[in-house]
């Protein structure tokens, strides 16, 4: 019979800390995706690697409250708080979508103290592409 291999370290001890190691990020990109149902805020470094993200749903808002400006403001505040602790000073903001949370998320980003290089609207606009869905009759 083969000898059992002795355990050097258990799995529990190997993952005691956070998996993501904190590194100083002086500049980043803040992506705000505002739909009518939810607002998602993602913070990346200049290469596009995700550092932090938050959405109205993860902040505790459920149902139709996720699309409100207050929910977007809370989501933006949560995402920015973590990167501000990592030392982010400058950022670019990319806003996408027609939702109500666009302005509220931008207001929360402005109030955070991070200097904004520019704010760009990257909402996809068709040049008369696919036919849009039929209008709702309520």
Swiss-Prot record:
One of its GO terms (biological process) is translation. Residues 9-22 have a biased composition (Basic residues). PROSITE patterns: RIBOSOMAL_S11 (PS00054). It comes from the Eukaryota. SUPFAM superfamilies: Translational machinery components. GO terms for molecular function: rRNA binding; structural constituent of ribosome. Residues 1-22 are annotated as: Disordered. GO terms for cellular component: chloroplast; ribonucleoprotein complex; ribosome. Disulfide bonds: none annotated. Its main location: plastid. Pfam families: Ribosomal_S11. It is found in: Plastid, Chloroplast. The keyword ATP-binding does not apply. Keywords: Chloroplast, Plastid, Ribonucleoprotein, Ribosomal protein, RNA-binding, rRNA-binding. Part of the 30S ribosomal subunit. This is Small ribosomal subunit protein uS11c. It comes from Lotus japonicus. The gene is rps11.
């Amino acid at each position: 019979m083969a000898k059992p291999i002795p355990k050097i370290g258990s799995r529990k001890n190997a993952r005691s800390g956070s998996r993501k190691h904190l590194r100083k990020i002086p500049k980043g990109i803040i992506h705000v995706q505002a739909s009518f149902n939810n607002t998602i805020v993602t913070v990346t470094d200049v290469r596009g690697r995700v550092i932090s993200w938050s959405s109205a749903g993860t902040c505790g808002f459920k149902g139709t409250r996720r699309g409100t400006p207050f929910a977007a403001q809370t989501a933006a505040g949560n995402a920015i708080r973590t990167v501000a602790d990592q030392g982010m000073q400058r950022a670019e903001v990319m806003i996408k979508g027609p939702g109500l949370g666009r302005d509220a998320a931008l207001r929360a980003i402005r109030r955070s103290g991070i200097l904004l290089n520019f704010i760009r609207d990257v909402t996809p606009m068709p040049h008369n592409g696919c036919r849009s869905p039929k209008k709702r009759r309520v």
